[in-house]
Amino acid sequence: GKATERVARPMVGIKPVVMVPDEKARAYAESSAPAREEPDGPTLHATNEMRRFATPWSVAIARAKLLASTQLPPGLILDPACGSATQLVALCTLLNRPGLGVELSGAAAPLAAINLERSSIWSSGNWTETSRILWGDGTMAESILQTYHQSIGATTTVALLHIDPARPQNAQQHTLEEMQPRLDHLLASWAPFLSREPALILDLSPRLSDAQRMEVDDLVSSIWNDIPRTWQWMTQGRGRIDRLSLWVGPAADSESHRLARLL
């Protein structure tokens, strides 16, 4: 069907679909979310609303650079709530690893597929052949991996799980229950398919209270016990904290807390 028809159906509980960056998808991306060149980055599609809430390229690539010196296990970069895939393609580009992005929104999934294609041309890396975007429910881990492995004709492992769930635009509290997909559901779904000490980055609201951060800590501990972790606050200056994330397993460093300044 037409690209506009593809965006209408909800995908919760339905088998995921591989998004093909074909002419229909390109036409849909150009008409619904004109591409914009990122400073020192690729040209990416996103609607104005997506750009308001998405991770900027400068932040996405700064995060990826922090991982460059870590010893990640073999495998792919997984983002089960990838949006327009800015963070995913930054990680794939800098780490030269294939990526698997899953997006529930039928409006965003085609954009993610085109952005993956655009970034592969821009970076000229060798990570693109087995990179895919799936339209579907990011909590359906087994079905997602099955669809992905069928698509690439091989099986592979997950090197890094990056999670940045959508949060309500008008939320004041930014509680864990407001995240979509829910963090506890995502981690419980993917845990059986990860290594015993997986590398994770959980992108969270900087408005989380200490008690809410403890909730996230407890959630991680309930699955992976005393796995190493580092809480990271990121600032772009102006005297405020812009980003909060939890780096787990091989993604963590020797400190339990750190402040990253984006220059």
Q: Which residues does each predicted region cover?
A:
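Conserved SAM-binding loop of SAM-dependent methyltransferases across substrates and taxa
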Residues: 84-96
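Conserved class I S-adenosyl-L-methionine
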Residues: 74-81
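Short, glycine/acidic-enriched loop or turn micro-motifs at the edges of active sites
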Residues: 82, 106, 140, 167-168, ...
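S-adenosyl-L-methionine
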Residues: 1-72, 107-154
